[in-house]
Design a protein with these regions (language model features):
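P-loop NTP-binding core
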Residues: 1-173
Length: 173
């Protein structure tokens, strides 16, 4: 049921398929419907952060602060955008964070553990994933109740979709 979909990862290993646009517009629409929404920008291009009108270089607390070893509580990194709509922003370069995450135990559950304390505060948590199957995407898929996969309508996109579905099944087992 839709009510069971609290955490939704918007993912596709291809770039340019409207992951960020989908995340942003779905978040705004749900907030307008009086649902409390948290957006998470996991993309190292910080596209979601930029699309909501924020400047990644000016952010004091970002997803990096949440996911790094001995990181800050996610509650300290949430910014309100408008009524019912909040965001955890990203920065332009997440490569050092990804390298650090890869060296940790239970590395695929880092985001899940970080979000636990705030999950009950939101009706929906929407995660904008990077355009590759990185440790960040694996974290998003591990904590998601569902995955929204935007695709272009062509054969190569369809082939990529089946590969992503296989990866999702593997991660969730």
């Amino acid at each position: 049921s839709v009510n069971a979909l609290k955490v939704i990862a918007i993912a596709n290993q291809k770039g340019g398929v409207a992951k960020t646009t989908t995340t942003h517009n779905l978040g705004v629409a749900l907030a307008a419907a009086r649902k409390k929404v948290l957006l998470i920008d996991l993309d190292s291009q910080a596209s979601l952060t930029i699309s909501v009108g924020l400047e990644p270089l000016e952010m004091q607390h970002t997803i990096v602060d949440v996911l790094k070893k001995d990181g800050a509580p996610v509650s300290e990194c949430i910014q309100q955008l408008r009524d019912n709509l909040h965001i955890v922003t990203s920065i332009i370069d997440l490569a050092p964070l990804e390298m650090e995450m890869l060296s940790r135990a239970s590395r695929e559950k880092i985001l899940d553990r970080a979000l636990k304390p705030v999950k009950e505060n939101y009706d929906f948590i929407l995660i904008d994933c990077p355009p590759q199957l990185s440790i960040l995407t694996i974290n998003a898929l591990s904590c998601a109740d569902g995955v929204l996969i935007p695709v272009k309508t062509d054969y190569l996109a369809y082939r990529g979709l089946t590969q992503l579905q296989d990866s999702i099944r593997e991660i969730q087992e």
